[in-house]
Amino acid sequence: MKNLKRIIFILLIILPLRVFADYEHFKLWDMSDGLSNNTVKSITQDHLGFIWLGTFDGLCKFDGVDFTIFRHDSQDSLSIINNYVEVVASLGDELWVGTERGLNLYSYKENNFRLCEWILPTGERQKITESIKN
């Protein structure tokens, strides 16, 4: 009887601990959920709470429910310069996007991209990727 009381006491202490155990929850998103590509090169969260993902096929903005995809459009000079996004960095209220063909700055207000270029002492404009190569 004494052993039974001891066992019951131990069970009463141990069993509630399982109730408070935290289990990690992960959600895997892929192209079927709206991601532009299943290979993600870079992830950042901006000052508004959006998650930005750089992929092999464009830049994705995730609002917690849906993805918005930004891709290069050769007919639009204000689109992202290239679909192969290497790096995405959020600095304050600016979003910097590094691609295979240059660095873009995203305008939240205008919902478009500006290509960042260096102006050389000669007055010539040069993409940052060209400056690095030289």
Language-model-detected regions and their locations in the chain:
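Carboxylate-rich, polar loop motifs that coordinate divalent cations or form catalytic acidic clusters
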Residues: 1-134
